[in-house]
Design a protein with these regions (language model features):
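Active-site loops and adjacent core secondary-structure elements that bind or stabilize anionic groups
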Residues: 31-251, 255, 276, 326-338, ...
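Charged, low-complexity helical/coil segments in non-catalytic cytosolic or luminal regions
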Residues: 261-275
């Protein structure tokens, strides 16, 4: 028998009875105990126990029903709030510029000299754990510049850039493939790129997703896809340093490779905005402005805050053919060479970088 001011029939049915093989009775008043004991000692025992267990099962089912309903109500409420906080763009007022080509092209032999001015040395210093302006930072900068001087005519970078008609849904970007599409020959009609949405509103009250920045179906909007990596000769030189047991020199070259790829990403994105896609032909920005993303559009990279799922790399491989520039993917979607980057180009003027 269970009784007391802090007990209840529901608590007994849900929390106590399932833990005990025998019957567990809840009594509101101790005066009921003798009456219940008489029933259990007499010929009404089986009937009393059967009624008890039936009633407790009904209580458990009713609680489960209410719990499920409350959960559904919460989900619906969150979905309603999320939909209310989704960014809404008046697409009729937007100018959707067509890229200069559709499909995929390779940009070979991007020179180190071309991208060198775009290196963000702050990130280089962060990698080495030195502060800007310190003697340590100045010393490693001199060594890095000397290495760049030595390799600038020996190695290069390569890129793949594709442009595709696309449209946004509530949770993805859908890429359309034309007949003769270089990635599939038009056999595969669409590629769906999932774009996760923020679960909490930002400062402006929106829960952002990259799909918000791509026009709905039927408006002839486009996105770009890109990948950039160092040349095979760069990778071979780096591996040779590792085999020779030169940890400092190999780390210096690896860190420069990472910075060169990011610099090439900045340089190529500028070319895309001004000429290759051409949606911002009159852009005039300084390098420091580029670091602060003051340009129109964005280039979210796979595996980074707004596209965190590394397996999206396999979709990118389908779109632009990473092997064409000697990028290989691991089973988890990581790229080799390590000094590589891959992502999307989105041109909308309201697009911004954000974290999921």
């Amino acid at each position: 028998f269970i009784g007391g001011a802090t007990t209840s029939a529901l608590h007994t049915a849900v929390k106590i009875a399932p833990l005990y093989d025998g019957p567990v009775f809840h009594v509101k008043d101790a005066a009921q105990n003798p009456i219940l004991a008489m029933q259990l000692a007499g010929n009404q025992r089986e009937h009393a126990i059967a009624c008890l267990r039936y009633g407790q099962e009904q209580l458990r089912q009713e609680l489960q029903r209410k719990t499920n309903q409350q959960a559904q109500d919460v989900i619906k409420s969150e979905a309603k709030n999320l939909k209310a906080s989704t960014l809404s763009i008046s697409w009729e007022d937007e100018t959707l510029v067509q890229p200069t080509y559709k499909g995929v092209r390779t940009f070979e032999d991007i020179s180190i000299n071309a991208v060198r001015p775009y290196i963000n040395w702050k990130h280089f210093y962060n990698l080495w754990g030195v502060r800007v302006g310190t003697p340590e930072a100045e010393a490693i900068r001199r060594e890095a510049e000397a290495l760049l001087d030595a390799i600038q005519h020996k190695h290069h970078l390569s890129a793949r850039v594709g442009f595709f008609e696309a449209y946004g849904t509530e949770s993805s970007i859908v890429v359309n493939h034309e007949v003769g599409c270089p990635c599939c020959g038009g056999v595969q009609k669409q590629t769906v790129i999932p774009t996760p949405r923020q679960s909490r509103p930002n400062a402006e009250g929106y829960c952002l997703s990259l799909c918000d920045y791509v026009a709905p179906q039927g408006m002839n909007d486009h996105i770009g896809a890109f990948a950039i990596t160092v040349s095979s000769s760069f990778v071979e030189a780096l591996e040779a340093l590792k085999r020779q047991g030169e940890p400092y020199d190999s780390l210096l070259m690896q860190s420069l490779g990472d910075r060169l790829v990011e610099a090439a990403s900045e340089w190529l994105h500028e070319q895309v905005r001004k000429t290759i896609w051409g949606y911002a032909p009159d852009e005039r920005l300084e390098i420091q402005d580029l670091y602060k993303a003051k340009y129109q559009g964005i280039r979210p990279a796979i595996g980074y805050p707004s596209l965190p799922d590394q397996k999206t790399m396999f979709l990118m491989d389908e779109l632009i053919g990473l092997s064409s520039i000697n990028i290989r993917l691991t089973e988890n979607g990581a790229m080799y060479p390590q000094a590589s980057v891959c992502g999307l180009y989105i041109a909308n003027r309201k697009a911004e970088y954000f974290m999921i």
